[in-house]
C-alpha cells in the first residue's frame, strides 16, 4: 500500500510588509500593548480579526512589535516602513536595516560580521519559501531594536488576517 501524496505547499505570499521599531527596553518588555485583547489559537475570518483588533485601541496605536509576528498585519498601514513583492528586495531591506543598526548593538557578538552573514542567509532562505523574518537586538544604553519582514496575502501562520493596505 502506498502512502497518500503529501499536501500541496501553502501558496507563496503576494508581498512582504517591513517594520522597524527602536525604543526603550522597558517599553518593549511591557506586553500589554503588544497583544490583541483575545488569545486566538485558530484561524478566524478576516472580519473577526478586524473586530478583535478594533477592540483594543492600545494595541492598534502601539508601534511596539506585537508578540505574534502576523499581528503586525492587524495594525494600521501607516506603521509599514516598506512593502516588496520580491523576496530578494525584502531581504535587501532587512540587511540594510540591520547594517544601519549594527554599530549600536550592545554586544560584540551581535556586531560580528560572520554572525550577521548567517542571519542574512537565513533571511534569504526563509523569504524564499514564504516565511517571515524577525530580528531583535539590545542596543547600547537601555534601547532595543526590532526589524521584521512579514509575509502577507497570505501569511503562513495566520492566513486569514487581511492585508493592512486593503
Question: Which role does the model predict for each range below?
Answer:
Residues 13-24, 81-83, 136-140, 144-151:
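Ordered hydrophobic segments in well-structured contexts
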Residues 66-73, 84, 123, 133:
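Residue-level detector of functional hotspots within protein domains
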Residues 72-92:
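A short, exposed loop/beta-hairpin motif centered on an aromatic-Gly-Thr core
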Residues 85-102, 106-107:
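A short, charged, amphipathic alpha-helix used as a generic interaction element across diverse proteins
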